[in-house]
Amino acid sequence: MRSPRTRGRSGRPLSLLLALLCALRAKVCGASGQFELEILSMQNVNGELQNGNCCGGARNPGDRKCTRDECDTYFKVCLKEYQSRVTAGGPCSFGSGSTPVIGGNTFNLKASRGNDRNRIVLPFSFAWPRSYTLLVEAWDSSNDTVQPDSIIEKASHSGMINPSRQWQTLKQNTGVAHFEYQIRVTCDDYYYGFGCNKFCRPRDDFFGHYACDQNGNKTCMEGWMGPECNRAICRQGCSPKHGSCKLPGDCRCQYGWQGLYCDKCIPHPGCVHGICNEPWQCLCETNWGGQLCDKDLNYCGTHQPCLNGGTCSNTGPDKYQCSCPEGYSGPNCEIAEHACLSDPCHNRGSCKETSLGFECECSPGWTGPTCSTNIDDCSPNNCSHGGTCQDLVNGFKCVCPPQWTGKTCQLDANECEAKPCVNAKSCKNLIASYYCDCLPGWMGQNCDININDCLGQCQNDASCRDLVNGYRCICPPGYAGDHCERDIDECASNPCLNGGHCQNEINRFQCLCPTGFSGNLCQLDIDYCEPNPCQNGAQCYNRASDYFCKCPEDYEGKNCSHLKDHCRTTPCEVIDSCTVAMASNDTPEGVRYISSNVCGPHGKCKSQSGGKFTCDCNKGFTGTYCHENINDCESNPCRNGGTCIDGVNSYKCICSDGWEGAYCETNINDCSQNPCHNGGTCRDLVNDFYCDCKNGWKGKTCHSRDSQCDEATCNNGGTCYDEGDAFKCMCPGGWEGTTCNIARNSSCLPNPCHNGGTCVVNGESFTCVCKEGWEGPICAQNTNDCSPHPCYNSGTCVDGDNWYRCECAPGFAGPDCRININECQSSPCAFGATCVDEINGYRCVCPPGHSGAKCQEVSGRPCITMGSVIPDGAKWDDDCNTCQCLNGRIACSKVWCGPRPCLLHKGHSECPSGQSCIPILDDQCFVHPCTGVGECRSSSLQPVKTKCTSDSYYQDNCANITFTFNKEMMSPGLTTEHICSELRNLNILKNVSAEYSIYIACEPSPSANNEIHVAISAEDIRDDGNPIKEITDKIIDLVSKRDGNSSLIAAVAEVRVQRRPLKNRTDFLVPLLSSVLTVAWICCLVTAFYWCLRKRRKPGSHTHSASEDNTTNNVREQLNQIKNPIEKHGANTVPIKDYENKNSKMSKIRTHNSEVEEDDMDKHQQKARFAKQPAYTLVDREEKPPNGTPTKHPNWTNKQDNRDLESAQSLNRMEYIV
């Protein structure tokens, strides 16, 4: 018994053999290849990242370009299964890789193809599915351990690619950077097919004798056949039934058979005159008999034994009898009674009779009893030097070699007589030979071989033409010289334009263009807007070295590719599920309405009642949020077993082998390459063909006369069997058909793709094309639709299959929880109360006379007007007046509203009862044209006129105001009455008109077409107030501060107020000079007044009448003029005037920048005295200091001492100035 150690050693070779077989089996059944990607060029002219920042830190402060440091560019690649909608998430199921840093902002690597630094190789060991999705990202490498790497640009591509040595070039021409790259899929050695899963390794040994063609099919070597090419092809004609062979051309017979082709049987041993049809038979020939067919049944006919004319008779098997003629005797009549009578001696021999018969004397050269044998004169050989002896009659002849001659070849022949030397100077005869003295360039025995002078002469793969005693090099393109040793400099002519740098290459050159230029010669000014990198309808503007995208309001980013979140930095008000309001300076209302983007990128939102919405989806999409891609493959449009891949409002058919066309409706003509040889006729089949062979030719392509099988007969590893007049293919798993050319689709049965994925067959493997929302090799991974988080206001996101749902916090609603539920929508507050919506609640603001949580408790009496009940405290508008219910009493403002405007083409429908639409007079049109504009008037009623005259003043309860307008800021069609009506509707009149009856009338100025005279009067005047002065001051203050949100007020350029003229006091100096006591009293009075004025702090500015101090009048200081900041200093600008000796008060527009300016204004209000100047002007003035530089004075520039305001007459005549 062997020890365990001994058994272990004996079992080790067996285990190694099993492991080797398993490895071989795995390699044969597997797949192997690689996906290759090469970066060709990169163009990032600004050195920017995708987020707009610079690769090298801050921008250049001069031109704001990223020129301080270039990007350290490298690339990352992710290869995954085919996706109709590319997603960045999910695993790189086919592989991933990256390059080292290969360049800066801009580089071109096309000239250095094959460099491993810019190449990424992703090996795979599965059947290549042909369809794929590729993600390529350009990154900036950061050496800083704190600052991570940043992405520059990324590109994605989905498509199909078959294994090939050819490269496929792709470009990324949108975004911050443009780059170009090429891809290909190659199978490893010994792997073939679209999936690199067909294994074929050439061999010539016991297991097979074959090579591999370009499709991986085994091509048998000459003399071999069979699926593994291990069956030798026997000698042509070798019986396939009774012969065989182990080596090509051999024919070894089976037992019992013989012959060159093993087609003859071996007869029974000893069979003499017999044949056989099967081995060991002895079938006698005619006239033969016996067990061994050795008995002659016709001896006379067979042997003719009787001589000299004797007659033969058969007497039995192998027996006969001769009847001899006269003079002959013997068994065969061979004895002649006269021996020489029959002339027995041949070749002219003489016969002599003897006692025993006869005797022959032969002539020279013959011998034998009857002189029939020729004497061999060549024995022994008489020819020398290898001459050949030919026997003659009574002699011989020597056939000598060329070097010898003579009867017995003993003489040396002169070979030079035959002139054997072709290209020689001379011929010299030698013993048994000769010598040719060759000319230069020739060699050989006869100087007929041209010496090859090309060996090692030509460089750089040039071809050499051999000459006589010389050579000539034919240079490839790009080289020159006798030996093609010199590279032609294609840059010598300076072909690059616009400062491009020429880089010399083999038979070509490359221009490295400066920034902003492109083309082979840098002749093209790069249009960075072609193709347009801007997305979502943005306008592209080309720059010298970059482009600029003017994004729509709803998008942002370098290429306007990102949806702008307006509510991120600006407070938004949710209107409904579809609309969000945000503050904007681009609209007159100051509000812009934007979409909530609830329907995503594939739909438009339509609001419904109750906060609901519907989505109007783009073509190809459906679902609540337009998130579902409509399955265009549902109708099965692909024919003949084609696989349908759904797209967006489209589909694509991946056809089965043998079919093509948009719907896989066209059978590929497999006869187009004329595969049939030797006159065979081709008939097209599905993914196959059939050759109808003629004239004895056989095989799939009529190429053989020996066998129906060859290397191309059965496809995809099928085994071919020759059945005489036809062949039969035994197909491996997954294939069927006459020549194993049809895939069974078994790899997709049952469907391995989950969640509605489409299975695409590739031989024995498959690929899943996933629906949107799913990813992974078998579509089993759900895409996270909640990333990034889409829900607002603390809403919870629930992820679904290509959808999500927001579960909102209390108080919020809508698809993304952006809508604050309006608890005021149900009007919970009592009539007249104001409901204030809050988060998950509301609050009621009660009007006067109401109380309670919902203002349901009433404390005042309601009013009844026009048949309606108005609650206590409620307000409403009545034409240009405002009314309010006060505990059962209606109180309204009392402003005369003037005639109502109307349109002539509408007739009297716009006018009250009893009035008609009368066209306005031409002088009443303030801003032309006023076509079709009228006023509602009654023929019985005369226009209301105020009691103001041209010399009316505040003391008369009247005001005359002149407005100067900038017509460029006013709309055409405005009438004088339109302007007057807007003045009547100013809010500043509401409180005043509640106590007094106010009349405002307007007339165009007869002297200037941009001025309107306004007369304001009041009734019911009491002694304790002057409403006209209050109204005038408020109008001037409103114009000065641009308050009121009115386009009319914004168009006012100047305001002048008529006031009472001042009287000159000629006796002012008399009391001043009378005594020092009077001067002291005036100073005390001025001091007291100044103290009171500071304490009051009224908003107006004050004026006083000019004193009669001639010294003060001599120093005339101009006041600041307030001008409209919108008014341009053009031809229509009203000049600043000094209205001397005129009863007017003028105000120009002054800007107010802040409350601080108002406080400063109050602190620095002063009074000034001017002789003979009752009109005052307040302006914004720029004064020049001594150095000539203009400076802006803050609002009020009058620095006059307040002590000058000591006159009582000045106090009485103080006016407000704005």
Swiss-Prot record:
Provide one Gene Ontology biological process annotation.
pulmonary valve morphogenesis
- The annotated regions of Polar residues compositional bias extend over 1189-1199
Report the residue ranges that make up the EGF-like domain in this protein: 230-263, 264-294, 296-334, 336-372, 374-410, 412-448, 450-485, 487-523, 525-561, 586-627, 629-665, 667-703, 705-741, 744-780, 782-818, 820-856
Q: What does the UniProt entry list as the effect of changing residue 37 to S?
A: In ALGS1; the mutant is unable to activate Notch signaling
Give, from the UniProt record, the effect of changing residue 274 to D: In TOF; temperature sensitive mutation; the protein is abnormally glycosylated and retained intracellularly; unable to activate Notch signaling
The entry annotates sugar attachment on 143, 217, 382, 559, 745, 960, 991, 1045, 1064
Query: What protein does this entry describe?
Result: Protein jagged-1
Query: To which species is this protein native?
Result: Homo sapiens
**Record gene name:** JAG1
